[in-house]
Amino acid sequence: MRLPTTLLLFIGALIFSGAGTVRSDASDHRYKDGDSVPLYANKVGPFHNPSETYRYFDLPFCIPEGVKDKKEALGEVLNGDRLVSAPYKLNFRDEKDSEVYCKKKLSREEVEHFRRAVEKDYYFQMYYDDLPIWGFIGKVDKESKSDPSEFKYFLYKHIQFEILYNKDRVIEINARMDPHSLVDLTEDKEVDAEFMYTVKWKETETSFEKRMDKYAMSSSLPHHLEIHWFSIINSCVTVLLLTGFLATILMRVLKNDFMKYAQDEEAADDQEETGWKYIHGDVFRFPKNKSLFAASLGSGTQLFTLTIFIFMLSLVGVFYPYNRGALFTALVVIYALTSGIAGYTASSFYCQLEGKNWVRNLLLTGGLFCGPLFLTFCFLNTVAIAYSATAALPFGTIIVIVLIWTLVTSPLLVLGGIAGKNSKAEFQAPVRTTKYPREIPPLPWYRSAVPQMAMAGFLPFSAIYIELYYIFASVWGHRIYTIYSILFIVFIILLIVTAFITVALTYFQLAAEDHEWWWRSFLCGGSTGLFIYAYCLYYYYARSDMSGFMQTSFFFGYMACICYGFFLMLGTVGFRAALLFVRHIYRSIKCE
């Protein structure tokens, strides 16, 4: 237990040290009257397309003198954050009333640029003393008109800041756009714009330590919690009923099988065996494509370990709201540090299956998940570059990730592979395998791989689909998700149901005298990932307002990688459960 605990503390310390948080220049967040408080403009973009964001000054706002880019951590860059010094001066407890910071004549091209942005519901994001600020840049006045050509477009030119403070610390900031101070963008003509801002300070009793609670509470409101707990209870009841029903049948059938086989042993020796005992000489025959199978188990085990560590960090409060860069940092760091687990698992299991080319197996393990992810990233990063979006990673960040993969991930993968190869573990089979495989009898269509995968994936998916909406709304929207304890319960339910349904289907497969259960159990366990991807289609077209080539490609591209990861992880869980079950039942009977 000491190694996982030490690793968790190391990762947490690394993330807390600044790898993913938006840190101000004032490290202690204490200010005197008139002190400059850091204010950074982050990004702008269509409200319904969270991946399609641009630099704040890509819109033709007034660019002040001495604009500086903030040095960002890895997680911030991966999150698409591009912070620059903002044009507003919000010094501590310094009130301002309609102060003009810029007068500008907008050209026809700039008016058209702003109008397109307003039409797409562009919003902006800033950070003031690490606190997030949002607002829309303009509004569309439709006035009950159905013809879009008659709509009027306006740009907000007056932003009103209300800042709450407690003694020498900033506690909260709100930004409101003045609905009466507008610039008409409807016509393609030059327009004079006078941008201004107002600052009001108010004292509050809220402590500095609780200033982020406001953002976490939005997902913990009573009616939201009721929905989450209702979904949990509904999932638990459904799962208990279905798994209980299957367990009862399976236990009864197994009991009858054991009694039948015990009686057969006392009967005549020439009596023909039937059912799963009949194939005892083939059930532990190693699967085809041993190297790919072992690599899949190695990658799935690594992703399972990664998920557990992410849950541990979330439950101790590392991923608080608007510290989303920390999640990306944690994913990169933990994936790199756990690559040795993939190497060890794949190599040791491959050697147990009497594989000879362990180097090839190790290369396959290293590229099985990273390969598709890298190809997807290359395509999507090219799209982001074409759009000049902040999602396009800078060359320096790509070099950092390549160095992490080269100097950390790959060496640990090789070390784990060498350790697995030298473990000298033998595959534990309770019965001997015959020299020649038995022929599998003809089976009905519903016992083939695809129908079995459909049945195996539906039950686990039904246990998590309600919670999926909130996760999607957080990852691909602006909803805040902080109820990690509920999400962890859902994850445990998912694992239990996946393991159980895979065991049940494996038994029915063996009972039909089909001994090729290795790959089938893995595919059945991982099929929930396919259901999640099908849900992506439903969510995109029915529950979201995302649009455009970039957002569509980002959504389906990265969700394909995530669902593929779930496929490998849950496939590993399903196979491990099935292997324990098969070993148990064949250890419980006497086979010649």
From Swiss-Prot:
Residues 251-302, 347-365, 419-452, 507-521, 575-592 are cytoplasmic. It comes from the Eukaryota. It holds the Pfam family EMP70. Belongs to the nonaspanin (TM9SF) (TC 9.A.2) family. This is Transmembrane 9 superfamily member 3. The chain crosses the membrane at residues 230-250, 303-323, 326-346, 366-386, 398-418, 453-473, 486-506, 522-542, 554-574. The C-terminal KXD/E motif functions as a Golgi retention signal, certainly through the binding to the COP1 coatomer. Residues 1-19 form the signal peptide. Keywords: Endosome, Golgi apparatus, Membrane, Signal, Transmembrane, Transmembrane helix.
